[in-house]
């Protein structure tokens, strides 16, 4: 391979297939352009397992929309979307039009909804057949005017109803004006009506969740009664599917559950593994310090490993000084001193670790939920914080 001109493979898709024991990732590494050895491994088998788990909770007729916004929660937009399209999901949902345009460029042909449409992007959305969420009458009127300009009719939109999240959406008192708008022939059709649950993952909010669901039922009945075509209804997110599956309606929206996070402790599989390697090892005397601000106080002679991952890669700086750990050689070792922009140091005194050994930041041994709990945040933030300079590697047996 080293005798080959790698430029001949530019912009080509190459299938490298075989058992993991053959370490074909070395061939992939030779061919790829991005060579930073800190990587995010994405296990497509785990993702399909998780998708099928949520499918098993739903009636067969229930459609599934999958959230692929924010680079598919950090896992890679086009790659994950292609897998989901192959797996037969009904809709993909992105946050902004640019994300949808990127998916179309990657060959995605199934319907794509845009959750945060901006009027400036309406023309792009129409060009690439992206379906906007409509959360206000003003936005609906603006989009209808753009459709009139293009001479387009029956363009699908998704009506967002505010049932208690109080972030965006049409309130019950907005419905008369909405229905009056449709008394005149319009260029849009309502493809779906949906709402967002504020606390479906926590039992302490169950009464409020049921209040939201009942309000959603009332609002959608009022709207549907004025139209002679069926409008899709959806309110359940990942936690809602697990805890309130009887309200699946016509479609559900799967997000964090696809990535292995369950609201009920279900045996989902971790999808992403954030990994690097030991770049250097040094012996440091116990009376010395390590890192910026001399915050790495040792107290004993210590073997320090330097690993090429820092806060610019997505390793949260609040994990500095022993708060966080990494997995090396079958055990946990603590982070020493302050995490740097591009590197951090860990204590490997009690291991046989050497230069070149693999390091797991999170994955099968240190779960994303463990990190989010330790940092007082949510798994979404951990996953979406992994920098784009970190290479994504996809596995499927």
How does the language model describe each region?
Residues 7-10, 51-62, 152:
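Glycine-rich phosphate/diphosphate-binding loops that line cofactor/substrate pockets in enzymes
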Residues 39-49, 62-232, 248:
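Active-site-proximal beta-alpha core segment in soluble small-molecule metabolic enzymes
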Residues 13-15, 19-23, 162-165, 238, ...:
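Short glycine-rich anion-binding loops that position phosphate/pyrophosphate groups of nucleotides
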Residues 41-43, 48-56, 63-66, 99, ...:
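Active-site anion/phosphate-binding pocket segments in diverse small-molecule metabolic enzymes
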């Amino acid at each position: 391979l080293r005798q080959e001109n790698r430029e001949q493979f530019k912009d080509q898709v190459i299938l490298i297939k075989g058992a993991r024991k053959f370490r074909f990732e070395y061939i992939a590494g030779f061919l790829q352009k991005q060579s930073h050895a800190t990587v995010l491994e994405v296990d497509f088998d785990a993702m399909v397992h998780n998708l099928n788990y949520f499918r098993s909770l739903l009636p067969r007729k229930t459609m599934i929309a999958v959230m692929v916004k924010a680079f598919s929660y950090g896992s890679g937009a086009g790659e994950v979307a292609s897998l989901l399209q192959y797996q037969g999901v009904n809709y993909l949902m992105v946050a902004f039009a640019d994300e949808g345009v990127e998916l179309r460029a990657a060959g995605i042909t199934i319907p794509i909804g845009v959750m945060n449409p901006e009027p400036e992007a309406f023309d792009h959305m129409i060009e690439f057949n992206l379906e906007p969420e409509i959360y206000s009458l003003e936005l609906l009127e603006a989009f209808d005017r753009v459709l009139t300009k293009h001479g387009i009719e029956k363009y699908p939109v998704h009506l967002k109803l505010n049932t208690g999240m109080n972030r965006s959406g049409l309130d019950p008192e907005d419905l008369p004006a909405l229905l009056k708008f449709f008394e005149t022939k319009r260029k849009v059709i309502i493809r779906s009506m949906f709402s967002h649950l504020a606390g479906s993952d926590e039992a302490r909010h169950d009464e409020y969740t049921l209040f939201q669901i009942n309000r959603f039922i009332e609002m959608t009945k009022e709207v549907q009664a004025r139209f002679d075509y069926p409008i899709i209804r959806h309110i359940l997110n990942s936690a809602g599917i697990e805890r309130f599956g009887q309200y699946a309606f016509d479609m559900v929206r799967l997000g964090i559950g696809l990535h292995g996070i369950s609201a009920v402790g279900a045996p989902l599989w971790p999808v992403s593994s954030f990994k690097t390697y030991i770049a250097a090892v040094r012996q440091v005397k116990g009376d010395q310090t390590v890192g910026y601000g001399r915050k790495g106080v040792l107290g004993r002679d210590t073997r320090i490993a330097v690993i090429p991952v820092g806060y610019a890669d997505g390793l949260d700086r609040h994990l500095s000084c022993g708060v966080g750990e990494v997995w090396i050689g079958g055990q946990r070792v603590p982070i020493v001193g302050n995490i740097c922009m591009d590197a951090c140091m860990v204590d490997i005194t009690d291991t046989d670790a050497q230069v070149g050994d693999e390091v797991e930041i999170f994955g099968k041994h240190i779960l994303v939920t463990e990190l989010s709990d330790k940092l007082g945040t949510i798994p979404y933030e951990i996953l979406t914080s992994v920098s784009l300079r970190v290479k994504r590697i996809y596995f499927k047996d």
